[in-house]
Protein backbone atom coordinates (compact mmCIF):
# COMPACT_ATOMS: atom_id res chain seq x y z
CA UNK A 1 0.00 0.00 0.00
CA UNK A 2 2.82 2.39 0.93
CA UNK A 3 4.72 1.57 -2.28
CA UNK A 4 1.59 2.26 -4.35
CA UNK A 5 1.20 5.67 -2.70
CA UNK A 6 4.82 6.50 -3.45
CA UNK A 7 4.42 5.41 -7.07
CA UNK A 8 1.28 7.53 -7.40
CA UNK A 9 3.12 10.54 -5.95
CA UNK A 10 6.05 10.08 -8.36
CA UNK A 11 3.72 9.77 -11.36
CA UNK A 12 1.82 12.91 -10.35
CA UNK A 13 5.11 14.79 -9.91
CA UNK A 14 6.26 13.68 -13.38
CA UNK A 15 2.94 14.75 -14.91
CA UNK A 16 3.26 18.14 -13.23
CA UNK A 17 6.79 18.69 -14.56
CA UNK A 18 5.73 17.64 -18.10
CA UNK A 19 2.82 20.07 -18.01
CA UNK A 20 5.09 22.89 -16.84
CA UNK A 21 7.68 22.24 -19.58
CA UNK A 22 4.92 22.03 -22.20
CA UNK A 23 3.60 25.46 -21.18
CA UNK A 24 7.10 26.96 -21.51
CA UNK A 25 7.45 25.48 -25.01
CA UNK A 26 4.05 26.84 -26.07
CA UNK A 27 5.01 30.35 -24.92
CA UNK A 28 8.33 30.09 -26.78
CA UNK A 29 6.56 29.00 -29.98
CA UNK A 30 4.08 31.88 -29.68
CA UNK A 31 6.86 34.51 -29.80
CA UNK A 32 7.31 36.36 -33.12
CA UNK A 33 10.78 36.12 -34.69
CA UNK A 34 11.35 39.91 -34.77
CA UNK A 35 10.54 40.54 -31.09
CA UNK A 36 14.01 41.84 -30.20
CA UNK A 37 14.12 44.92 -32.43
CA UNK A 38 15.09 48.52 -31.59
CA UNK A 39 11.79 49.19 -29.82
CA UNK A 40 12.65 46.68 -27.12
CA UNK A 41 15.96 48.19 -25.97
CA UNK A 42 14.51 50.08 -22.98
CA UNK A 43 12.46 47.05 -21.97
CA UNK A 44 15.51 44.77 -22.09
CA UNK A 45 17.68 47.33 -20.27
CA UNK A 46 15.24 47.86 -17.40
CA UNK A 47 14.42 44.20 -16.86
CA UNK A 48 18.10 43.29 -17.21
CA UNK A 49 19.42 46.00 -14.89
CA UNK A 50 17.06 45.11 -12.06
CA UNK A 51 17.57 41.42 -12.80
CA UNK A 52 21.32 41.82 -12.31
CA UNK A 53 20.72 43.24 -8.82
CA UNK A 54 18.06 40.73 -7.80
CA UNK A 55 19.72 37.63 -9.23
CA UNK A 56 23.18 38.66 -8.01
CA UNK A 57 21.79 38.85 -4.46
CA UNK A 58 20.16 35.45 -4.87
CA UNK A 59 23.30 33.95 -6.39
CA UNK A 60 25.45 35.39 -3.60
CA UNK A 61 23.18 33.84 -0.97
CA UNK A 62 23.24 30.52 -2.80
CA UNK A 63 27.04 30.43 -3.18
CA UNK A 64 27.63 31.51 0.42
CA UNK A 65 25.05 28.96 1.61
CA UNK A 66 26.70 26.11 -0.29
CA UNK A 67 30.16 27.12 0.97
CA UNK A 68 28.87 27.03 4.55
CA UNK A 69 26.76 23.87 4.18
CA UNK A 70 29.27 21.68 2.35
CA UNK A 71 32.60 23.28 3.28
CA UNK A 72 32.75 25.38 6.42
CA UNK A 73 30.14 23.59 8.54
CA UNK A 74 31.56 20.03 8.15
CA UNK A 75 34.98 21.41 9.16
CA UNK A 76 33.48 23.11 12.22
CA UNK A 77 31.50 19.97 13.12
CA UNK A 78 34.71 17.90 13.12
CA UNK A 79 36.32 20.55 15.30
CA UNK A 80 33.45 20.31 17.79
CA UNK A 81 33.63 16.51 17.86
CA UNK A 82 37.33 16.66 18.75
CA UNK A 83 36.47 18.79 21.80
CA UNK A 84 34.48 15.87 23.26
CA UNK A 85 32.86 16.39 26.66
CA UNK A 86 34.43 19.84 27.00
CA UNK A 87 31.43 21.21 25.08
CA UNK A 88 28.84 19.81 27.53
CA UNK A 89 26.62 22.42 29.22
CA UNK A 90 26.15 22.46 32.98
CA UNK A 91 22.35 22.48 32.57
CA UNK A 92 19.82 22.52 29.73
CA UNK A 93 16.48 24.32 29.98
CA UNK A 94 13.83 23.35 27.41
CA UNK A 95 11.20 26.09 27.53
CA UNK A 96 7.95 25.49 25.63
CA UNK A 97 5.14 28.02 25.12
CA UNK A 98 1.65 26.73 24.26
CA UNK A 99 -1.62 28.48 23.56
CA UNK A 100 -4.70 27.24 21.69
CA UNK A 101 -2.99 24.43 19.82
CA UNK A 102 -4.95 21.24 19.21
CA UNK A 103 -4.39 18.45 21.74
CA UNK A 104 -2.87 15.97 19.26
CA UNK A 105 -0.17 18.45 18.23
CA UNK A 106 0.47 19.44 21.85
CA UNK A 107 0.93 15.78 22.79
CA UNK A 108 3.39 15.26 19.91
CA UNK A 109 5.37 18.34 20.91
CA UNK A 110 5.68 17.59 24.62
CA UNK A 111 6.40 13.92 24.00
CA UNK A 112 9.35 14.90 21.78
CA UNK A 113 10.57 17.45 24.34
CA UNK A 114 10.42 15.00 27.25
CA UNK A 115 12.14 12.28 25.20
CA UNK A 116 14.88 14.70 24.21
CA UNK A 117 15.31 15.82 27.83
CA UNK A 118 15.81 12.18 28.85
CA UNK A 119 18.00 11.12 25.92
CA UNK A 120 20.37 14.10 25.79
CA UNK A 121 21.96 12.93 29.06
CA UNK A 122 22.46 16.42 30.52
CA UNK A 123 20.83 17.80 33.69
CA UNK A 124 17.65 19.20 32.16
CA UNK A 125 14.62 21.21 33.25
CA UNK A 126 11.52 21.32 31.04
CA UNK A 127 9.85 24.70 31.57
CA UNK A 128 6.24 24.82 30.32
CA UNK A 129 4.69 28.26 29.87
CA UNK A 130 0.97 27.41 29.76
CA UNK A 131 -2.32 29.26 29.69
CA UNK A 132 -4.96 26.54 29.83
CA UNK A 133 -5.49 23.87 32.51
CA UNK A 134 -6.11 21.23 29.83
CA UNK A 135 -2.53 21.70 28.57
CA UNK A 136 -1.16 21.38 32.10
CA UNK A 137 -3.05 18.13 32.69
CA UNK A 138 -1.82 16.77 29.35
CA UNK A 139 1.82 17.63 30.17
CA UNK A 140 1.57 16.01 33.60
CA UNK A 141 0.08 12.83 32.15
CA UNK A 142 2.89 12.62 29.57
CA UNK A 143 5.45 13.23 32.31
CA UNK A 144 4.03 10.36 34.32
CA UNK A 145 4.03 8.15 31.22
CA UNK A 146 7.71 8.72 30.41
CA UNK A 147 8.78 8.81 34.08
CA UNK A 148 12.06 10.75 33.55
CA UNK A 149 15.13 10.11 35.74
CA UNK A 150 16.03 12.36 38.67
CA UNK A 151 18.27 14.70 36.66
CA UNK A 152 15.30 15.69 34.47
CA UNK A 153 12.84 18.07 36.14
CA UNK A 154 9.55 19.74 35.25
CA UNK A 155 8.56 23.34 35.99
CA UNK A 156 5.11 24.60 34.95
CA UNK A 157 4.56 28.35 34.66
CA UNK A 158 0.89 29.37 34.45
CA UNK A 159 0.24 32.67 32.69
CA UNK A 160 -2.69 34.74 31.47
CA UNK A 161 -3.44 34.49 27.76
CA UNK A 162 -2.09 37.97 27.02
CA UNK A 163 0.27 36.98 24.23
CA UNK A 164 3.38 34.99 23.41
CA UNK A 165 5.72 37.78 24.49
CA UNK A 166 4.35 37.66 28.03
CA UNK A 167 4.61 33.87 28.01
CA UNK A 168 8.28 34.06 27.02
CA UNK A 169 9.05 36.73 29.61
CA UNK A 170 7.41 34.73 32.43
CA UNK A 171 9.35 31.66 31.35
CA UNK A 172 12.65 33.58 31.24
CA UNK A 173 12.05 34.96 34.74
CA UNK A 174 11.24 31.47 36.02
CA UNK A 175 14.60 30.29 34.66
CA UNK A 176 16.30 33.32 36.24
CA UNK A 177 14.98 32.27 39.65
CA UNK A 178 16.72 28.89 39.19
CA UNK A 179 20.07 30.78 39.05
CA UNK A 180 21.66 29.05 36.04
CA UNK A 181 25.43 29.42 35.71
CA UNK A 182 27.47 30.68 32.74
CA UNK A 183 27.62 27.25 31.09
CA UNK A 184 23.86 26.64 31.03
CA UNK A 185 21.80 26.93 27.82
CA UNK A 186 18.12 27.56 27.13
CA UNK A 187 16.12 26.20 24.17
CA UNK A 188 13.01 28.24 23.37
CA UNK A 189 10.47 25.97 21.64
CA UNK A 190 7.10 26.85 20.13
CA UNK A 191 3.99 24.86 20.98
CA UNK A 192 3.73 23.37 17.47
CA UNK A 193 7.37 22.23 17.15
CA UNK A 194 8.29 18.55 17.33
CA UNK A 195 11.98 18.00 18.14
CA UNK A 196 13.95 15.50 16.07
CA UNK A 197 16.11 13.01 17.95
CA UNK A 198 19.48 14.39 19.04
CA UNK A 199 18.69 18.06 18.40
CA UNK A 200 19.96 19.14 21.84
CA UNK A 201 23.30 17.34 21.51
CA UNK A 202 23.76 18.82 18.03
CA UNK A 203 23.16 22.41 19.17
CA UNK A 204 24.75 22.84 22.61
CA UNK A 205 28.45 22.45 21.62
CA UNK A 206 28.52 25.60 19.50
CA UNK A 207 28.35 27.86 22.52
CA UNK A 208 31.71 26.48 23.67
CA UNK A 209 33.30 26.64 20.22
CA UNK A 210 32.13 30.24 19.68
CA UNK A 211 32.29 32.17 22.98
CA UNK A 212 30.56 35.21 21.48
CA UNK A 213 27.57 33.37 19.99
CA UNK A 214 24.56 34.35 22.09
CA UNK A 215 21.91 32.43 20.17
CA UNK A 216 21.46 29.95 17.35
CA UNK A 217 18.62 28.43 15.39
CA UNK A 218 17.92 25.17 13.57
CA UNK A 219 16.76 23.62 10.29
CA UNK A 220 12.99 23.24 9.84
CA UNK A 221 10.79 20.71 8.09
CA UNK A 222 7.01 20.81 8.22
CA UNK A 223 3.82 18.79 8.26
CA UNK A 224 0.99 20.93 6.89
CA UNK A 225 -2.62 20.36 7.93
CA UNK A 226 -3.94 21.73 4.66
CA UNK A 227 -4.18 21.23 0.90
CA UNK A 228 -1.46 20.41 -1.64
CA UNK A 229 -0.61 24.00 -2.63
CA UNK A 230 -0.50 25.17 0.99
CA UNK A 231 1.77 22.25 1.85
CA UNK A 232 4.11 22.97 -1.10
CA UNK A 233 4.13 26.68 -0.23
CA UNK A 234 5.34 25.99 3.31
CA UNK A 235 7.93 23.46 2.16
CA UNK A 236 9.29 25.91 -0.41
CA UNK A 237 9.60 28.56 2.27
CA UNK A 238 11.64 26.24 4.49
CA UNK A 239 13.93 25.25 1.61
CA UNK A 240 14.63 28.93 0.85
CA UNK A 241 15.06 29.65 4.55
CA UNK A 242 17.66 26.88 4.85
CA UNK A 243 19.88 28.35 2.13
CA UNK A 244 19.54 31.92 3.43
CA UNK A 245 20.31 30.83 7.00
CA UNK A 246 23.43 29.00 5.82
CA UNK A 247 24.51 32.11 3.92
CA UNK A 248 24.12 34.39 6.93
CA UNK A 249 25.74 31.85 9.28
CA UNK A 250 28.94 32.22 7.25
CA UNK A 251 29.37 35.65 8.88
CA UNK A 252 27.61 34.69 12.16
CA UNK A 253 24.80 37.12 11.43
CA UNK A 254 21.71 34.89 11.13
CA UNK A 255 18.90 37.44 10.85
CA UNK A 256 16.27 35.87 13.10
CA UNK A 257 16.12 33.70 16.18
CA UNK A 258 13.28 31.53 14.89
CA UNK A 259 10.51 31.26 17.44
CA UNK A 260 9.88 27.63 16.51
CA UNK A 261 13.17 26.47 18.08
CA UNK A 262 16.19 28.57 18.98
CA UNK A 263 18.82 28.11 21.66
CA UNK A 264 20.42 30.80 23.80
CA UNK A 265 22.99 31.11 26.51
CA UNK A 266 21.24 31.16 29.88
CA UNK A 267 23.14 34.37 30.67
CA UNK A 268 21.32 35.98 27.72
CA UNK A 269 17.74 34.99 28.56
CA UNK A 270 18.24 35.92 32.22
CA UNK A 271 19.56 39.36 31.27
CA UNK A 272 16.90 41.94 32.30
CA UNK A 273 17.59 43.96 29.13
CA UNK A 274 16.95 40.94 26.91
CA UNK A 275 13.76 40.05 28.79
CA UNK A 276 12.51 43.64 28.47
CA UNK A 277 13.31 43.67 24.74
CA UNK A 278 11.26 40.51 24.17
CA UNK A 279 8.40 41.38 26.52
CA UNK A 280 7.72 45.01 25.62
CA UNK A 281 9.51 45.86 22.39
CA UNK A 282 8.33 49.02 20.67
CA UNK A 283 9.13 51.37 17.81
CA UNK A 284 8.96 55.16 17.54
CA UNK A 285 7.73 55.97 14.02
CA UNK A 286 7.93 59.49 12.61
CA UNK A 287 4.31 59.39 11.39
CA UNK A 288 2.54 56.65 13.36
CA UNK A 289 3.99 57.51 16.78
CA UNK A 290 5.21 54.95 19.30
CA UNK A 291 3.62 51.50 19.23
CA UNK A 292 4.38 48.17 20.89
CA UNK A 293 5.20 45.02 18.98
CA UNK A 294 2.52 42.36 19.29
CA UNK A 295 4.13 39.72 17.05
CA UNK A 296 7.74 39.21 15.96
CA UNK A 297 9.36 38.04 19.20
CA UNK A 298 11.96 36.20 17.09
CA UNK A 299 13.02 39.50 15.49
CA UNK A 300 13.08 41.24 18.87
CA UNK A 301 15.34 38.57 20.36
CA UNK A 302 17.67 38.85 17.34
CA UNK A 303 17.83 42.64 17.61
CA UNK A 304 18.51 42.40 21.34
CA UNK A 305 21.40 39.98 20.71
CA UNK A 306 22.88 42.35 18.13
CA UNK A 307 22.46 45.35 20.40
CA UNK A 308 24.09 43.51 23.32
CA UNK A 309 27.08 42.59 21.15
CA UNK A 310 26.48 38.87 20.51
CA UNK A 311 26.84 36.82 17.32
CA UNK A 312 24.16 34.46 15.95
CA UNK A 313 24.59 31.04 14.29
CA UNK A 314 22.72 28.32 12.39
CA UNK A 315 22.99 24.53 12.83
CA UNK A 316 21.84 22.95 9.53
CA UNK A 317 21.92 19.31 10.70
CA UNK A 318 19.83 19.95 13.82
CA UNK A 319 16.26 19.49 12.62
CA UNK A 320 12.82 20.24 13.98
CA UNK A 321 9.44 19.36 12.50
CA UNK A 322 6.69 21.93 12.75
CA UNK A 323 2.98 21.20 12.51
CA UNK A 324 1.49 23.97 10.39
CA UNK A 325 -2.17 24.88 10.82
CA UNK A 326 -3.18 27.34 8.05
CA UNK A 327 -5.29 30.21 9.44
CA UNK A 328 -7.79 29.90 6.54
CA UNK A 329 -9.01 27.08 4.30
CA UNK A 330 -8.37 29.17 1.19
CA UNK A 331 -4.70 29.20 0.11
CA UNK A 332 -4.94 32.81 -1.11
CA UNK A 333 -6.42 34.06 2.15
CA UNK A 334 -4.12 31.99 4.37
CA UNK A 335 -0.93 32.92 2.51
CA UNK A 336 -1.76 36.63 2.51
CA UNK A 337 -2.58 36.53 6.20
CA UNK A 338 0.74 34.85 7.02
CA UNK A 339 2.69 37.17 4.71
CA UNK A 340 1.10 40.16 6.41
CA UNK A 341 2.43 39.00 9.78
CA UNK A 342 5.85 37.82 8.58
CA UNK A 343 6.67 40.85 6.44
CA UNK A 344 5.35 43.21 9.08
CA UNK A 345 7.70 41.69 11.64
CA UNK A 346 10.56 41.96 9.15
CA UNK A 347 9.98 45.59 8.19
CA UNK A 348 9.40 46.77 11.77
CA UNK A 349 12.88 45.52 12.68
CA UNK A 350 14.61 46.51 9.46
CA UNK A 351 15.13 50.25 9.82
CA UNK A 352 16.38 50.16 13.39
CA UNK A 353 18.59 47.16 12.59
CA UNK A 354 20.35 49.23 9.91
CA UNK A 355 20.75 51.89 12.59
CA UNK A 356 23.14 49.58 14.47
CA UNK A 357 25.73 50.54 11.88
CA UNK A 358 28.15 48.92 9.49
CA UNK A 359 30.75 48.15 12.16
CA UNK A 360 28.29 46.10 14.26
CA UNK A 361 26.45 44.36 11.42
CA UNK A 362 29.18 43.96 8.81
CA UNK A 363 29.03 44.92 5.13
CA UNK A 364 27.14 41.90 3.77
CA UNK A 365 24.47 41.95 6.50
CA UNK A 366 23.91 45.68 5.92
CA UNK A 367 23.47 45.07 2.18
CA UNK A 368 20.99 42.25 2.86
CA UNK A 369 18.95 44.46 5.20
CA UNK A 370 18.97 47.26 2.61
CA UNK A 371 17.85 44.79 -0.07
CA UNK A 372 14.91 43.76 2.12
CA UNK A 373 13.68 47.35 1.97
CA UNK A 374 14.02 47.87 -1.79
CA UNK A 375 12.91 44.37 -2.86
CA UNK A 376 9.24 45.31 -2.50
CA UNK A 377 9.71 47.58 -5.54
CA UNK A 378 12.37 45.71 -7.53
CA UNK A 379 10.26 42.54 -7.37
CA UNK A 380 7.40 44.33 -9.15
CA UNK A 381 9.51 46.20 -11.69
CA UNK A 382 9.81 43.38 -14.24
CA UNK A 383 6.07 42.67 -14.34
CA UNK A 384 5.18 46.37 -14.46
CA UNK A 385 7.63 47.07 -17.29
CA UNK A 386 6.35 44.03 -19.21
CA UNK A 387 2.74 45.22 -18.91
CA UNK A 388 3.65 48.78 -19.97
CA UNK A 389 5.73 47.52 -22.92
CA UNK A 390 2.83 45.28 -23.98
CA UNK A 391 0.43 48.23 -23.91
CA UNK A 392 2.83 50.39 -25.94
CA UNK A 393 4.39 47.92 -28.38
CA UNK A 394 2.34 44.72 -28.36
CA UNK A 395 1.55 41.62 -26.31
CA UNK A 396 4.74 39.87 -27.42
CA UNK A 397 6.67 41.62 -24.65
CA UNK A 398 4.44 40.07 -22.01
CA UNK A 399 5.08 36.65 -23.56
CA UNK A 400 8.85 37.28 -23.45
CA UNK A 401 8.54 38.18 -19.78
CA UNK A 402 6.46 35.10 -18.99
CA UNK A 403 8.99 32.86 -20.75
CA UNK A 404 11.82 34.52 -18.82
CA UNK A 405 9.98 34.02 -15.54
CA UNK A 406 9.21 30.39 -16.37
CA UNK A 407 12.83 29.54 -17.20
CA UNK A 408 14.42 31.41 -14.28
CA UNK A 409 11.97 29.97 -11.73
CA UNK A 410 12.71 26.49 -13.07
CA UNK A 411 16.44 27.12 -12.53
CA UNK A 412 15.79 28.45 -9.01
CA UNK A 413 13.73 25.35 -8.21
CA UNK A 414 16.54 23.06 -9.37
CA UNK A 415 19.00 25.05 -7.23
CA UNK A 416 16.79 24.45 -4.18
CA UNK A 417 17.56 20.73 -4.47
CA UNK A 418 21.00 21.59 -3.06
CA UNK A 419 19.31 22.54 0.22
CA UNK A 420 18.43 18.90 0.93
CA UNK A 421 14.71 19.71 0.83
CA UNK A 422 12.44 18.06 -1.75
CA UNK A 423 11.02 20.15 -4.61
CA UNK A 424 7.84 19.77 -6.66
CA UNK A 425 6.40 20.96 -10.00
CA UNK A 426 4.36 23.67 -8.26
CA UNK A 427 7.52 25.37 -6.94
CA UNK A 428 8.22 27.62 -10.00
CA UNK A 429 4.68 29.01 -9.88
CA UNK A 430 4.76 29.43 -6.10
CA UNK A 431 8.11 31.22 -6.35
CA UNK A 432 6.57 33.78 -8.67
CA UNK A 433 3.43 34.04 -6.53
CA UNK A 434 5.63 34.81 -3.53
CA UNK A 435 7.55 37.42 -5.52
CA UNK A 436 4.52 39.39 -6.73
CA UNK A 437 1.99 38.93 -3.92
CA UNK A 438 4.78 39.15 -1.35
CA UNK A 439 5.95 42.48 -2.79
CA UNK A 440 2.40 43.87 -2.77
CA UNK A 441 1.95 42.77 0.84
CA UNK A 442 5.28 44.38 1.80
CA UNK A 443 4.23 47.69 0.26
CA UNK A 444 0.88 47.55 2.04
CA UNK A 445 2.48 46.69 5.39
CA UNK A 446 5.35 49.18 5.01
CA UNK A 447 2.93 52.11 5.31
CA UNK A 448 0.95 50.43 8.14
CA UNK A 449 3.65 49.17 10.49
CA UNK A 450 1.44 49.72 13.54
CA UNK A 451 -1.19 47.22 12.30
CA UNK A 452 -0.47 43.81 13.83
CA UNK A 453 -2.44 40.65 14.56
CA UNK A 454 -1.92 36.98 15.37
CA UNK A 455 -3.11 34.32 12.94
CA UNK A 456 -3.86 31.62 15.51
CA UNK A 457 -6.28 33.73 17.51
CA UNK A 458 -8.22 36.93 16.81
CA UNK A 459 -5.79 39.14 18.75
CA UNK A 460 -4.79 42.52 17.30
CA UNK A 461 -2.75 45.42 18.63
CA UNK A 462 -5.01 48.00 20.28
CA UNK A 463 -3.73 51.55 20.66
CA UNK A 464 -5.51 54.10 22.83
CA UNK A 465 -5.18 56.98 20.40
CA UNK A 466 -7.22 60.16 20.10
CA UNK A 467 -9.79 60.09 17.30
CA UNK A 468 -7.83 62.60 15.20
CA UNK A 469 -4.63 60.56 15.52
CA UNK A 470 -6.46 57.39 14.44
CA UNK A 471 -7.98 59.25 11.47
CA UNK A 472 -4.61 60.75 10.53
CA UNK A 473 -2.80 57.41 10.71
CA UNK A 474 -5.43 55.68 8.57
CA UNK A 475 -5.65 58.30 5.84
CA UNK A 476 -1.97 59.17 5.75
CA UNK A 477 -1.20 55.46 5.27
CA UNK A 478 -3.66 55.25 2.37
CA UNK A 479 -2.35 58.47 0.82
CA UNK A 480 1.30 57.41 1.03
CA UNK A 481 0.54 53.97 -0.41
CA UNK A 482 -1.32 55.49 -3.37
CA UNK A 483 1.34 58.17 -3.91
CA UNK A 484 4.25 55.72 -3.84
CA UNK A 485 2.52 53.31 -6.24
CA UNK A 486 1.57 56.15 -8.60
CA UNK A 487 5.12 57.54 -8.71
CA UNK A 488 6.51 54.03 -9.31
CA UNK A 489 4.20 53.40 -12.29
CA UNK A 490 4.56 56.95 -13.69
CA UNK A 491 8.36 56.79 -13.72
CA UNK A 492 8.30 53.44 -15.52
CA UNK A 493 5.80 54.79 -18.10
CA UNK A 494 8.25 57.62 -18.83
CA UNK A 495 11.26 55.32 -19.16
CA UNK A 496 9.84 52.42 -21.18
From Swiss-Prot:
Keyword DNA-binding applies: no
Entry GO MF terms: hyaluronan synthase activity
Designated gene of the protein: alg8
Segments crossing the lipid bilayer: 9-31, 51-73, 383-405, 425-447, 471-493
One Gene Ontology biological process: hyaluronan biosynthetic process
Family that this chain belongs to: Belongs to the glycosyltransferase 2 family.
Stored InterPro entries: Nucleotide-diphossugar_trans
Entry's localization field: Cell membrane
EC number: 2.4.-.-
Alphabetical list of Pfam families matching this protein: Glyco_tranf_2_3
GO cellular component, one term: plasma membrane
Key words, A-Z: Alginate biosynthesis, Cell membrane, Glycosyltransferase, Membrane, Transferase, Transmembrane, Transmembrane helix
Associated pathway: Glycan biosynthesis; alginate biosynthesis
Keyword set includes Transmembrane: yes
Membrane topology category: Multi-pass membrane protein
Protein name: Glycosyltransferase alg8
Function: Possibly a processive enzyme that polymerizes GDP-mannuronic acid.
Enzyme class: transferase
